[in-house]
Each structure stands twice: as structure tokens, then as C-alpha cells.
UniProtKB/Swiss-Prot annotation:
SUPFAM superfamilies: Defensin-like. It comes from Nematostella vectensis. Expressed in ectodermal gland cells. The lineage of its organism: Eukaryota, Metazoa, Cnidaria, Anthozoa, Hexacorallia. Has toxic effects on zebrafish larvae. It causes contractile paralysis and twitching of the tail within 20 minutes, followed by death within 30 minutes. Does not show any toxicity when injected into arthropods (cherry shrimps or grass shrimps). Negative results: does not show activity on all voltage-gated potassium and sodium channels. The keyword Iron-sulfur does not apply. Residues 1-26 form the signal peptide. This is N.vectensis toxin 8.
Amino acid sequence: MNSLLKVAVVCLVMLVACFVPRVILTDDADTEYNSDYLLPKRAGCKCADGRQETYYFMGCQGGWYRCSPHYVIGDCCKKFSGKYGTFAVRF
């Protein structure tokens, strides 16, 4: 009976561990992570020119523009950063 209880406790701990969302710590992620694009950013997105850019779940933030119409939910965003048309990639 005692071993059955130990097995049940181990199974319960494993079950809880599988369903608890992963916590992103500051040393595990860069300082630009926020809740708008935390998960999709890990997967990445590509703009029309094929370059990988930042994905925002709730639309592009200020100073950024949508560069790919292929996402049903959220936007693949690119930031304009110069008078000669160069773009900054935000990773």
C-alpha cells in the first residue's frame, strides 16, 4: 500500500508539472520580451521579403508597421530605422 501511494504521488507531481505553464525568467529571455509576443516570438515570423522579424499578437506597436499579410491573428512587424530605408530587426 505504501508503494502504491508513492507511485500515485509521483504521477500527480508529473501531471502537474506537465500542465503548469513554463515561466520565462530574465536570464532565459532577452529584455524585450513582453506578454504581447512572448510565445509567437520564439517561433518567429517572416515578412514578404523573407526576412525573419518580430511577431506581435495584438498588432504592431508604435514605430513598427505590418510587413506580412499572411497571419490571421497578430502581425509580423518591421521597424523603420533610417532615412535610407534600412530596417532594424528586433530579436
